[in-house]
Amino acid sequence: MAKKRDRIVNTQPFISDDASVASSRKRSKVPKTHQKQEKLIEAGMSEKIMKQALAQQKEVADEENAERNPSSAAFAVAGAATAGEEQKILEEEEDDIDDFDGTFENQSQFDKQEEINEDDEKLFESFLNKNAPPQRTLTDIIIKKLKDKDADLAEEERPDPKMDPAITKLYKGVGKFMSEYTVGKLPKAFKLVTSMEHWEDVLYLTEPEKWSPNALYQATRIFASNLKDRQVQRFYNYVLLPRVREDIRKHKKLHFALYQALKKSLYKPSAFNQGILFPLCKSGTCNLREAVIIGSILEKCSIPMLHSCVALNRLAEMDYCGTTSYFIKVLLEKKYCMPYRVLDALVAHFMRFVDDIRVMPVIWHQSLLTFVQRYKYEILKEDKEHLQTLLQRQKHHLVTPEILRELKDSRNRGEKEDPMVDNFAPVPAKEDRFDIPEVPMEED
């Protein structure tokens, strides 16, 4: 019979309070090449590795999220976009400016243009300001400023600002490049314009009214990310907006690169409102086609609630232009929670037409319907009565009955829900087990 082997006993306990006892063996590893040579990975290579790793982690996380909850996967990107992430995204896009190949992701979707009803367009023209002054551009402003400073330049058609001749020659060459630009890298001199104190004068030398659409798109990306709100507002108002309106009126549609430039301009929503939306409505010459194209950008893109409220309040107080109703309707359909001040301003806006003898366009009635549908519980009782009086004078055979129904079938601001609903709430029965009634029993 074979001899039994002795059991090996470990004298050390499995769990010890002393950290020095529970020491584990370290496996010897072969040193890596850069460790053996005592060299570090270069900063550029390290940054590329980190970017690639983060991209892969995000891709894996998105796939796992899509498997767990397919219905919400489509909205994951939109819901996760915060202000900091938007800044990071824009910085990455700025790094990719030199890689621009002239193509856009959503170009196939843009080809489906919305048709404009000619009758509606003629009705809108009756609300336009016939005596409105022409819109000023950056060139007009700089020329006027130069001529006011120096009377000797009054006879020159396009005078040059007083600068170093080398700088003037350089940026005139940049302007010629921008007029022919389609794809590829932009000159480094152009990227430095945003850091200059007199950037408007330098930009004037490049003749921005002659830039190609793709060049204006690239310029909008650079200016939106590097200039402050007040500065980029002037770029939007005096460079981007005149070019967009000119392109729409000339071709009856908007070049896709200019459309993308408008979308990029929404990165600074305050500057977009002050530089594009408000001047457009204030001009009194915005036609229906311009409103539909620019309004589609507001419809597709996300706008912060605060800026949306400010825009609605300002539009409600402006002198009415037919297309103002279109922008009001688009912003109301965002369904943001509005302050009472904005809601009261909108009521006052609609009540201005109670004595107007003109036939209001359909979009005016639709904007009123949208307002009542979204915020009927936040309108005062007196304001609802005033709106009903308005609807007796401004009628539409299809829209007006819907507005009246919404006004009647809703509670007023400050009122609670119908108290009749609480009467049907179940009341727990009280039972006394010591006071049980006698139950008669039948005898057999």
Curated annotation (Swiss-Prot):
One cellular component term from this protein's GO annotations in UniProt: nucleoplasm
Gene3D superfamilies (alphabetical): 1.25.40.480
Subcellular location: Nucleus, Nucleolus; Nucleus, Nucleoplasm
Predominant place of localization: nucleus
InterPro entries hit by this protein: Bystin
Chain intervals with Basic residues compositional bias: 24-34
Tissue expression pattern: Highly expressed in flowers and at lower levels in roots, hypocotyls, stems, leaves, siliques and seeds.
GO biological process: embryo sac development; pollen development; rRNA processing
Keyword Nucleus: yes
Region (Disordered): 1-37, 53-85
Knockout-associated phenotype: Delayed pollen development with reduced nuclei content leading to reduced pollen germination capacity, and pale seeds with arrested embryo development at the globular stage in homozygous plants. In heterozygous plants, slight accumulation of the 23S-like precursor P-A3. Reduced siliques size with small non-developed and early aborted seeds.
Compositionally biased intervals (Low complexity): 73-84
Top-level taxonomic group: Eukaryota
Record keywords: Nucleus, Ribosome biogenesis, rRNA processing
Regions annotated as coiled coil: none
Protein family membership: Belongs to the bystin family.
Role this protein plays: Essential protein required during embryogenesis and pollen development. Required for processing of 20S pre-rRNA precursor and biogenesis of 40S ribosomal subunits.
Subunit description: Component of the 40S pre-ribosome.
Protein name: Bystin
Protein species of origin: Arabidopsis thaliana
Gene: ENP1
